[in-house]
């Protein structure tokens, strides 16, 4: 079993959720295509999340920009 699997099994859900958000944010920042920001309004880590995802697509001479906002 991998270290990551061990980490998931041995931790409470809130810790797993925070880790997942951190990993996802890092992945997006490292790839420099997506910018992800979330705001935790409650203490549950899963309720009332506001997600703002900006996706940049680059093609030859022109740049197209897509913004997606989700408010659960």
From Swiss-Prot:
Keywords: Activator, DNA-binding, Transcription, Transcription regulation. It comes from the Bacteria. GO terms for biological process: positive regulation of DNA-templated transcription. GO terms for molecular function: DNA binding. Probable trans-acting positive activator for the tdc operon. This is Threonine dehydratase operon activator protein. It comes from Escherichia coli (strain K12). The gene is tdcR.
């Amino acid at each position: 079993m991998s270290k990551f699997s061990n980490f998931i099994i041995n931790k409470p859900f809130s810790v797993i959720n925070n880790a997942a958000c951190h990993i996802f944010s890092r992945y997006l920042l490292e790839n420099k295509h997506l910018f992800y920001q979330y705001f935790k309004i409650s203490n549950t880590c899963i309720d009332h999340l506001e997600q703002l995802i900006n996706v940049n697509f680059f093609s030859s001479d022109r740049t197209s920009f897509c913004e997606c906002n989700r408010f659960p």
